[in-house]
Amino acid sequence: MTEKSVFIGQKPVRNYVLACLTSLYSGSNKVVVKARGRAICRAVDTVEMLRRSMKDLQLENIMLSTEEVAREQGRKSNVSAIEITLSKP
């Protein structure tokens, strides 16, 4: 079973939906949508659009975490992260 990861950033949601669909139709059985910080809402939108377009797509796992990121002047801050695993039967 192959698994591909799609990292969500600042591009439009449709670009990420297309990337996920391409990997699913090119032989991958699983897609992991990953995002941090403000991109989390864009990741959730991507997954919902995928679930609407592919009725047989299954939500396998959702993992939430907090990552420590180094900022300017040596400060550290916590950033939320999400990983959503989708699979097709």
Provide a role label for each language-model segment.
Residues E3-N29:
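An N-terminal amphipathic alpha-helical segment
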Residues F7, V32-K34, E83-T85:
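Beta-strand cores of modular interaction/reader domains in eukaryotic scaffold and signaling proteins
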Residues K11, R36, S87:
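Structured beta-strand/turn binding interfaces of compact recognition modules in eukaryotic regulators
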Residues P12-R14, A39, E68:
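Residues that cap or initiate secondary-structure elements
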Residues R38-K55:
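Conserved helicase motor "Helicase C" RecA-like lobe of SF1/SF2 P-loop NTPases
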